[in-house]
Amino acid sequence: GIETKFSFLFNESLITRARNYLADEFLRSGYTHMMFIDADVQFNPQDIIALLALDKDIVGGPYPKKSMNWKNIAETARKHPDMDVSELNKVVGEYVFNVVKGTKQFTVTDPIEVMEIGTGHMMIKRQVFEKMEEEFPLIRYKPDHVGQEHFDGKNYIHAFFDTIIDTKDSSTGYLHSYIIKFRY
């Protein structure tokens, strides 16, 4: 069998902070892979085994966006009036990833290279976090949201999933992801 540990973080509205907490806890364990599964992502447990078998540094499973593409749903319902309503999302769902430029077609059941993918169903090898810590040792902070085990506001943790506010664009106040690219 495969030894597993489940970690849950409740009442945390900042996704980047929650992911940093969970990554920090993961790095204090002896496990080799970390798997993010958001509460609203449906999956088959065999999907986890399939992701593990791909042996990639970072690999994600496709899952639908939270919004529905009503135009595609209406078109599919017209073309396939006998289709069970519960099957519609499998056919018309828009997924949380962007394929690399030049990709003409794909299926969500086969591995494909992507430019970006949501972290709501993502597996990351330990070595990815360790490499980021090694390459960018200064990107650390003291969590201000105390109350979780190991997070009492005294210790620094790494900001693997960091977000900053663009203070130069005060008209929008949008949050911009701060992404660090590195190669192995």
Give the residues covered by each predicted segment:
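A short, glycine-/small-residue-rich helix N-cap motif at loop->alpha-helix starts
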Residues: 13-18
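Acidic donor-binding loop at a coil-to-helix junction in glycosyltransferase catalytic cores
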Residues: 144-148, 173-181
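Active-site neighborhoods of divalent-metal-dependent phosphate/nucleic-acid chemistry enzymes
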Residues: 162-175
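Phosphate-handling catalytic cores of nucleic-acid transaction enzymes
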Residues: 26
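Short, acidic, metal-binding catalytic loop of nucleotide-sugar glycosyltransferases
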Residues: 1-3
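Short beta-strand-to-loop acidic/aromatic patch adjacent to the donor-nucleotide binding site
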Residues: 29-44
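Conserved catalytic core of nucleotide-sugar-dependent glycosyltransferases
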Residues: 23, 44-164
